[in-house]
Every structure is written in structure tokens, then in C-alpha cells.
């Protein structure tokens, strides 16, 4: 990032950008930004997880770019739809998209070859996915077909449920965010498939911490790994012979889920806001984004980046990542952005885990989670 900041400062002599990490991890930023907001010392721009967007917007200290993003120069519609939705909680555009990812199915090519099982097809279905996971499970060799997190992070447990829900025509919440809809027939069918895989086929590694599936995959004990582009450096460093395909389809849809993050602009006066907009408009332009991608291994936040000459160099630097970038076209919907979202996710994630662990039936667990979510959603004041 510092190199990009230096380039911007050199080409924009009337604006000086100072970069700061803000914390040891991105997760550390929210409490620091929240503290700064309370003290009246908010930064001009901060990198904020998309799941925090609604809470940050509630502060009253963010800008609203809604009236300017479609003017010439911003190329707003060149951002992927999920990113556009996440940066606009409640319809208020609080900044610019910063990062996008998605879930796909990563598989161990050597394990498939050894088992004599054809590798997954990009056009596969959930029934085929179940059959492949069952075939690849080998208790004698301690090999599981696929993973699903049941502990450690309820968001991780929940967001793997959303693609199958959307693919079957379901929704997470009502349009007004007052009622949970994830317990629809689409949701029950989706969770029932995973329940059968976990409790009947015994083909699913139920990860109790959401951190054990990765080493299980790199050590050759997990045939298929439902994860995302953040795994690419780890897999290549571990010299795993891997490839990836989109998530299986229901009704012909391979829709996936994405967790976009944002560059949020805080209102520190019109001059500083204008400077922040100029910087982020420049930073998120295709060529600068490609430079960032080369150093970070992140996916393109704009489809137009895939057409740049330097894109092929990015593909060479991060072997295997190309299909994950192509899979962004399947990230069509975003998770809701509202202050109560973390608590809704807790209710849903705990319900899903109870089913996969054999402690509850899909419909009953989803109905209970929906009742809890409805109560949370209708509490005045939100989160």
C-alpha cells in the first residue's frame, strides 16, 4: 500500500496521504475506529470489514456518496454487484469497495487420482457433490470428503449456507429486514443435504474451530475444501497439487457468497472529504487495483481488470487463482448490512451447527433460529 500512496502523492501535489496500518489485523480496526469516532479523531479513510458497514454508518460520521457515484469518472457499475451492495448500508454509500472474495470448491488432484474418482466438473450439481464427497471419504486413511465449520465463528458457519439458499430461490431476510426468511423450503432443502452428508454419509469433516480444515487439506486428509482465494498462498507454499471449481448448482445456478470489504470515508470537513474521494477514485481504478493485486493476491474488484495486459502476470504469480476470479460473476447477492446482523448470524450459525452435529432436525432448527432472529430484528435501536 505504501508504494501506491507514494505514487498518488507524487502525482497529486496538493493532497498528502499518510498511510497507517491501524492495527495488527483488519479485525483490530473496528474498535480503534470506534474509539476514534467517540473522541472526535476519526481518520479520513479506514479499511472496514463489510460486516461492520451498518454499525459504522450508524455513527453519523460517515459520508454519503449516493448522489455522485454515477457521475463520469467513477465507473461505479464496474464494481461487482455484491461490493456495491455492501458499501451502501440502508442505501447510504459510505465509501468505495476495497476487496471482494468468494467461496468455491478447492480439491486435491492427487487424492482424486489415487482414488480413481473423476475430478469435479464446473457444471456439477449438489447431488453430484454429495456423491463425490462420499466416494472420496476413506476412514481407513482418515480422509474426509469435504469440510464444514461448526464452531469458532458463526458467520463462517452461516455464510456457507447462503449460496444453496439463494440458488434454490430463497432469501435470508425480508426486504425490510424485519423478518427472517432463511427457514423457507429452500433453506430446509439446503440444510437437509448437508445434514445427510454429515450424519448419514459421514463424508463431512465438522470443523469445531473453523481453523482445522486448512491443515487437514494441506496434509492430504481432506479431498475437497470449501474456501476462498485467501488460501492460495498457503496451498502453493505447501506445494499441494490443487485446482478449484465453482460451488455445485441447484436449478442451474452456481451462485456463491462473497464477503466484500470497504474503504469508508469519514466526514472531517468538505476539503478532507473531497481529498479522500479523489484518493479512493484513483486507488480503485483498474490499473492501481492490479498493482495492489500483484502484491496482495486479492481478487479483482472490477471485471474490467480481467482485460488489462498485466492481468496475465497476476495469474502467473498466483497459480490456480484464475477460476476464483472468474467465479465472481456468481457473487450476485450480498449478505444483509444491518446493525443486528452479528446476532442474527449467531442464531442461524448455532442452528446449522446443531443439525450437522445430529442434535436437531433441519426444519426445527431453522424455525427456532428464525424466531430468535425475528426478535432480534424487531428490537428498537438495532444491535
Named regions from a protein language model:
Residues 1-61, 70-77, 91, 119, ...:
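Conserved N-terminal structural module of periplasmic/extracytoplasmic solute-binding proteins
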Residues 10, 115, 181, 192, ...:
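Extracytoplasmic/periplasmic substrate-recognition and gating elements
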Residues 44-47, 223-228, 243:
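Paired acidic/hydrophobic, glycine-rich loop segments that form the ligand-binding mouth/hinge
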Residues 48-103, 157-160, 241-245, 310-317, ...:
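Hinge/lid segment of periplasmic solute-binding proteins
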Residues 63-79, 121-122, 144-155, 168-189, ...:
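Short, solvent-exposed loop/beta-turn-alpha elements that line the ligand-binding surface or hinge
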Residues 82, 294-347, 354, 379-380:
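Long, aromatic- and glycine/proline-rich binding clefts that accommodate carbohydrate-like moieties
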Residues 89-98, 103, 127-179, 186, ...:
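Extracytoplasmic/periplasmic solute-binding protein
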Residues 132-135, 176-206:
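Glycine-centered hinge/linker elements that transmit conformational signals in sensory
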Amino acid at each position: 500500500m505504501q508504494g501506491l500512496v507514494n505514487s498518488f502523492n507524487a502525482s497529486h501535489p496538493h493532497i498528502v496521504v499518510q498511510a497507517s496500518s491501524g492495527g495488527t489485523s483488519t479485525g483490530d480496526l473496528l474498535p480503534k475506529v470506534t474509539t476514534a469516532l467517540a473522541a472526535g479523531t476519526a481518520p479520513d479513510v479506514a479499511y472496514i470489514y463489510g460486516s461492520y458497514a451498518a454499525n459504522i454508518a450508524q455513527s453519523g460520521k460517515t459520508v454519503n456518496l449516493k448522489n455522485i457515484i454515477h457521475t463520469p469518472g467513477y465507473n461505479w457499475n464496474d464494481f461487482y454487484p455484491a461490493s456495491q451492495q455492501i458499501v451502501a448500508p440502508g442505501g447510504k454509500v459510505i465509501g468505495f469497495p476495497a476487496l471482494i472474495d468468494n467461496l468455491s470448491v478447492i480439491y486435491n488432484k492427487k487424492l482424486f487420482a489415487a482414488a480413481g474418482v473423476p475430478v469435479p466438473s464446473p457444471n456439477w450439481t449438489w447431488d453430484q457433490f454429495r456423491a463425490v464427497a462420499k466416494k472420496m471419504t476413506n476412514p481407513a486413511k482418515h480422509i474426509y470428503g469435504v469440510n464444514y465449520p461448526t464452531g469458532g465463528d458463526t458467520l463462517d458457519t452461516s455464510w456457507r449456507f447462503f449460496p444453496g439458499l439463494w440458488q434454490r430461490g430463497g432469501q435470508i431476510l425480508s426486504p425490510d429486514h424485519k423478518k427472517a426468511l432463511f427457514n423457507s423450503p429452500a433453506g430446509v432443502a439446503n440444510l437437509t443435504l448437508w445434514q445427510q452428508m454429515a450424519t448419514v454419509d459421514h463424508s463431512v469433516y465438522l470443523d469445531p474451530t473453523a481453523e482445522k480444515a486448512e491443515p487437514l487439506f494441506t496434509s492430504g486428509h481432506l479431498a475437497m475444501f470449501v474456501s476462498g482465494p485467501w488460501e492460495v498462498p498457503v496451498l502453493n507454499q505447501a506445494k499441494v497439487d490443487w485446482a478449484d471449481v465453482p460451488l455445485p448448482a441447484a436449478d442451474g445456478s452456481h451462485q456463491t457468497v462473497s464477503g466484500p470489504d470497504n474503504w469508508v470515508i469519514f466526514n472531517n470537513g468538505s476539503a478532507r472529504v473531497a481529498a479522500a474521494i479523489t484518493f479512493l477514485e484513483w486507488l480503485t481504478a483498474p490499473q492501481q487495483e492490479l498493482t495492489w493485486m500483484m502484491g496482495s493476491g486479492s481478487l479483482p474488484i472490477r471485471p474490467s481488470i480481467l482485460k488489462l495486459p498485466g492481468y496475465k502476470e497476476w495469474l502467473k504469480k498466483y497459480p490456480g487463482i484464475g477460476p476464483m476470479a472468474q467465479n465472481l460473476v456468481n457473487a450476485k447477492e450480498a449478505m444483509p448490512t444491518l446493525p443486528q446482523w452479528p446476532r442474527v448470524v449467531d442464531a442461524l450459525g448455532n442452528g446449522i451447527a446443531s443439525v450437522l452435529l445430529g442434535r436437531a432436525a433441519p426444519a426445527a432448527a431453522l424455525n427456532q433460529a428464525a424466531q430468535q432472529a425475528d426478535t432480534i430484528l424487531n428490537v428498537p435501536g438495532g444491535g
